[in-house]
Amino acid sequence: MKNRFFLIPGALGLGFLILFGIFTSERQDLVLDGKGTTVFFDFNDDAVNSETTICGNMCNGIEKNTSFVQGITGSAVKFEAQNESWLTVPHHPSLSFGEEGGVTIVFSVKVDTHSYKHNMIYNKGNVGWGHFYTPSYDGLYEGEYLAFQAIWTGDDVQEYVNVMCNDGKEIELNKWYFVAHVLEPDHKTLKQYINGIEMCSSTSEKPLNTDSLDDLNLGHVEGTYNDFSQLTLDNFTIFNYSLTADEISTLYQKLS
């Protein structure tokens, strides 16, 4: 089954960014600067692409074995590892993890189980990973601590950031968390916010090159790990610039 998402183009310098999903009237102000430089999945509507855009049908989202359940605001998408469910958006030059102004990725997530060691939330090749993670691959220390983590890489070993905020507390099951990853305009520092509060950051030796020809995947990573997830995701949003701490707090208040 293929679900197509409504697309609206937005200009940013020489590039373009697109808007996925249909904003409900009470949430129009999610685009904080009004420039339309946002990619947004609200999962409320299985909408077809009814607009003529720079990328046309090439930017339709493709849903694979997912289900839709009650979310924070309307529907949310549920990924189940046993069904190998995920959502992919084919690559297009208009889809980016940031230009000169940085990038912000925010989402609400509810984890169903601690048994999966690499619960991928989003992935775009080697550029950007965000997942729910237990650090022991051999299983010897499973459950010691679990955390949200983001790993972003560039073209060489000096382009690397890794944020995992370990406060000694396990992520609670079946509880919604609001997570934000903010790459600063210099493309060197990545910050992680949990429920509107900055928790930790990581700084790269060199600015990250965030260009990637890979598809954007939600709930799955293809390649070496080929992992699937066991979680529920709502309001997945990409801003093609760096949000401030106050703007992150505002989004958290609106989407909680």
What role is predicted for each listed range?
Residues 175-183, 192:
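Short tryptophan-centered beta-strand motifs in secreted/extracellular beta-sheet-rich domains
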Residues 5, 17-84, 212, 248-256:
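Extracytoplasmic low-complexity segments
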